[in-house]
Amino acid sequence: MATGTEPPQINTGVHGVSRAAISPRHLRTDRWWIAPAMTAGGLLAFIVYSTWRAFANADYYAAPYVSPFYSPCLAENCAPMRGGPNWEIFGSWWGLSPALLILIFPLGFRLTCYYYRKAYYRGFWASPPACAVAEPHKNYTGETRFPLILQNIHRYFFYAAIPVAAILTYDTVLAFRDEHYEWGHMGLGTLVLLVNIVLIWAYTISCHSCRHIIGGRLKHFSKHPVRYRLWGWVGKLNDRHMLLAWASLISVALADFYVYLLASGAFDDPRFF
């Protein structure tokens, strides 16, 4: 019940008392809304596609290729994969798609990624929608409250993303077989998985958390020349983190879609040798 003695609400963020009072929302003359709109559209398209494929629980293995959405396959209801990463850790009681057991780690890594946070904050929440454009929200709390405070677990998702990328690397090695599991062969699917894993590793290593783990908390780089050299290499990749984020997101979706087409019988895998 209101008593009439409540303290007045003080706006924060761009509407705070310490900020200059500018009546127009922005002074930009370009089409600033195109970038956040395209970002939202791209992320929404991936969300719709990955949700469909994750719950489909079908057409994710076409020897010798396995979809990155389903690897490693940890449930008893996984499709048989000769030599593949199908570990029956979860028994017959697990009746849902096995993709739901593993996708939480790479998706959690991307969801808490510094670049993706910027992308969906702007694209979906308009917080802010673009540089030099005021956000529509009256108050701003940043990432200090639930659920956004959970963004701070990004580093731990990075640790989980490393073994997932390693397993996808193993899948790529297995792709140098034919449909009869004979080694020394390569098809278009091998190339698709190879490009995908290179982009996934590049995106993972270019992560801000990886850069800090390698070169952070050092007072004197001269005393740690190896870490300094690695930090410099990761820093160069970090400059292209946004590009690698989108390239790897597209490549993992294309890799899954290619395996889906093969497994569903749309066409046969073209073989190089």
Place the predicted regions along the sequence by residue.
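Membrane-embedded alpha-helical bundles that constitute the cytochrome b-like, heme-associated redox core
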Residues: A2-F273
